[in-house]
């Protein structure tokens, strides 16, 4: 199972959520959202994505984190869902973020098992 690159953030997600919460509750100020442009993520990872796309084997299965953490219609990658952080910092997943990926891996393994 090959897992493609994950979107990453330039800021610590949990710290940013804390600051956002303080600004909104104490000062009624809106802090910027915690997301990145999908196009930026793709362009920053274009080389490795192209290399991974060239890999092909009947026993190679691919997981695309951008399908899990990015909204194609909004063209944004998210780092929190309903106030729950999916990343513990700029690049590491929280348990909630890891659960999303783990569920996808389990689903893929079950699909592979059912095909045999």
For the regions a protein language model found, what residue spans apply to each?
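Extracellular glycan-modifying ectodomains
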Residues: 1-116
């Amino acid at each position: 199972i090959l897992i493609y690159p994950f979107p990453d953030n330039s800021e610590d997600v949990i710290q940013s959520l804390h600051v956002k919460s303080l600004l909104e509750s104490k000062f009624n100020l809106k802090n910027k959202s915690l997301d990145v442009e999908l196009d930026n993520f793709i362009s920053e990872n274009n080389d490795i994505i192209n290399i991974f796309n060239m890999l092909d084997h009947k026993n190679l299965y691919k997981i695309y984190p951008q399908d899990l953490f990015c909204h194609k219609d909004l063209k944004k990658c998210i780092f929190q869902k309903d106030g729950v952080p999916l990343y513990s910092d700029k690049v590491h997943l929280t348990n909630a973020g890891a659960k999303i990926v783990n569920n996808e891996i389990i689903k893929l393994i079950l699909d592979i098992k059912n095909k045999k």
